[in-house]
């Protein structure tokens, strides 16, 4: 076997590999022994026909594909080792026409991590960030707490208005025919939430309990149910209940009810303290991000598409995981929004490229500065994970693969590298 690098361009390397005719002949014999039971040729018991007879009936190339599959892993790995190539994904293989008795030649195009250098990363100048807590910030938190502790109460002496919750029955029809999913009983709907088709909720404003209302709407052109998109519909609606939100008064009693404090002043001071801590952490995190961005802006490198695609896979999986906390999943989200997964992936691509680039740069700096993850730091991180997943740490360790542990260590190194860069940055 012989090999050579015939092209190296950015993150793409093209290898040419030659397999000696004798070695490929051995692979053909192995392929014959593996496949011979498939052939049923007259005059021979099934699987007993000699190789030459099988080739005569089915063509000399009958075993070529399997023979190549047999020989490829060995010669491909040998070529990678010879040229010190570490691919990030499977190769794109182009096999030249195979001629009996001659050497077999193929090319393999692989992506590799980019080669680059990072310099002048110590003492990076970034703007000092500072966020001050204002009275309106504290009031916003108090209002949010009051809103969270509000309750819905039934009203009977007035008509529906914006912000009310109504309990309704409805039956939708297109061209006088009821459609699937268009009928419900005692459905709750908050007026102004945009939960229903545009124009539906507004037509209930001013109506009273017990009224039967004919609501006329047109489904949006981009509506997820294609058979309804753009069509006019009539909903027969009956209003059973009207409820309004009762928000508690923000006073000492409120503070006692919603917190561990006895007075509103104590609650307010605690909120202020937490907001100031959040503001401080926000400033620190933004400064850290600015340091990374300033360094990354000075480095030009191409990211292998396979690595970017894997990062997008991770981002999609994380997005799907977060959707599940809202009672959704990725498939339903795509259907609901009329978005194709390919389009969503493309929307994520710029962030994926940025994430991978930053990680590569931080890994390079970490290696130059001899930053490592100690056993104690790994153990501390595993303890945090065990607590997060509500799991015994020994059980967690048992379930983790070596590659998982390596990824955790890499995360620790990246965090420590950012710490190093932030500590050595100049705030201006």
Curated annotation (Swiss-Prot):
UniProt enzyme class: isomerase
GO (cellular component) term, any one: cytoplasm
Catalytic activity: [protein]-peptidylproline (omega=180) = [protein]-peptidylproline (omega=0)
Keyword Transferase included in the entry's annotation: no
Entry keywords, A to Z: Cell cycle, Cell division, Chaperone, Cytoplasm, Isomerase, Rotamase
Single Gene Ontology BP annotation: chaperone-mediated protein folding
Residue intervals of the PPIase FKBP-type domain: 163-248
E.C. number: 5.2.1.8
Compartment annotation: Cytoplasm
Principal subcellular localization: cytoplasm
Stated role: Involved in protein export. Acts as a chaperone by maintaining the newly synthesized protein in an open conformation. Functions as a peptidyl-prolyl cis-trans isomerase.
NCBIfam families (alphabetical): tig (TIGR00115)
Domain comment in the entry: Consists of 3 domains; the N-terminus binds the ribosome, the middle domain has PPIase activity, while the C-terminus has intrinsic chaperone activity on its own.
Protein name in UniProt: Trigger factor
Organism from which the protein derives: Alkaliphilus oremlandii (strain OhILAs) (Clostridium oremlandii (strain OhILAs))
């Amino acid at each position: 076997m012989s090999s050579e690098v015939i092209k190296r361009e950015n993150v793409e390397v093209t290898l040419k590999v030659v397999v000696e005719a004798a070695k490929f002949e051995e692979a053909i014999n192995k392929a014959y022994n593996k496949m011979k039971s498939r052939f049923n040729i007259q005059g021979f018991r099934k699987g007993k026909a000699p190789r030459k007879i099988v080739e005569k009936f089915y063509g000399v190339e009958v075993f070529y594909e399997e023979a190549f599959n047999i020989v490829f892993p060995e010669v491909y790995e040998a070529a990678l080792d010879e040229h010190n190539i570490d691919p990030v994904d499977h190769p794109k293989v182009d096999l030249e026409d195979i001629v009996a008795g001659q050497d077999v030649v193929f090319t393999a195009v692989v992506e590799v991590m980019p080669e680059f250098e990072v310099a002048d990363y110590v003492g990076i100048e970034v703007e000092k960030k500072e966020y001050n807590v204002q009275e309106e910030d504290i009031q916003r938190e108090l209002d949010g707490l009051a809103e969270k502790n509000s309750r819905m109460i039934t009203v009977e002496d007035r008509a529906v208005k914006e912000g009310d919750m109504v309990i309704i029955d409805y039956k939708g029809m297109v061209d006088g025919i009821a459609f699937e999913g268009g009928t419900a009983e005692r459905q709750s709907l908050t007026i102004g939430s945009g939960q229903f088709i545009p124009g539906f909720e507004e037509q209930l404003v001013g109506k009273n309990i017990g009224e039967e209302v004919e609501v006329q709407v047109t489904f949006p052109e981009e509506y997820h149910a294609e058979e309804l998109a753009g069509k006019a519909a009539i909903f027969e609606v009956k209003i059973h209940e009207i409820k309004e939100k009762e928000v508690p008064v923000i006073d000492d009693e409120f503070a006692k009810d919603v917190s561990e404090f006895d007075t509103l002043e104590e609650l307010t001071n605690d909120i202020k303290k937490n907001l100031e801590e959040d503001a401080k952490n926000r400033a620190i995190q933004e400064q850290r991000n600015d340091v990374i961005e300033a360094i990354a802006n000075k480095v030009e490198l191409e990211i292998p598409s396979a690595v970017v695609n894997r990062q997008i896979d991770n981002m999609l999986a994380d997005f799907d995981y977060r959707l599940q906390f809202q009672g959704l999943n990725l498939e339903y989200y795509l259907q609901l929004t009329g978005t194709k997964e390919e389009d969503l992936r493309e929307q994520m691509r710029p962030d994926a490229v940025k994430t991978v680039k930053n990680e590569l740069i931080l890994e390079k700096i970490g290696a130059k500065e001899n930053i490592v993850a100690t056993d104690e730091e790994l153990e501390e991180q595993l303890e945090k994970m065990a607590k997060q997943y509500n799991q015994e740490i020994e059980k967690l360790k048992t379930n983790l693969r070596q590659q998982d542990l390596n990824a955790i260590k890499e995360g620790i190194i990246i965090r420590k590298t950012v710490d190093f860069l932030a500590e050595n940055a100049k705030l201006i």
